[in-house]
Amino acid sequence: VSLGALDDSVKAVKIDGAEATADNVKSGDYKVSRPFNIATKEGSESELAKDFISFILSKEGQAVVAENGYISDDNAEPFSGSNPSGKIVVGGSSSVSPLMEKLIEAYKENNPDAEIELQTTDSTTGMTSAIDGTYDIGMASRELKDTELSEGLKAQVIATDGIAVIVNKNNMIDELSSD
């Protein structure tokens, strides 16, 4: 289960002696993780899409990432956006969607004139819809495929998600090996 969605209803097991925590993923001690990517069609980004992406990658956007249990970029620069008005559609991965919802809320505090529609589907739909222009920004909880990149998508990692290996709370297993 996604580290950002982990709760007390299940038990996360250690992998190779490391607990599933953001700090352990960041340090490399816990190795089960995946990137959260956004992608745009190169050259087709609107001013609003560029400004929103700038916010996501900024110190303020990455604070939202960290607050929601994901691994952020500690070296992000402060946001210095232009707050353009308009509408964009962001869509794709159901794993990225809860974090994107929080990022949209935080961005709209700075830019209330922005209209950002969020559509939750899956990573492949997010990428194909960014390629065909249905989505201004696509979301994927994986690396982009070569075929997607060859269609003109430009990907950016917005967070790293630790994947907690879980068992029933009553299960005796506390640790597994990656071997």
Pin down the residues of each PLM region.
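Exported/periplasmic ABC-transporter solute-binding proteins
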Residues: 1-179
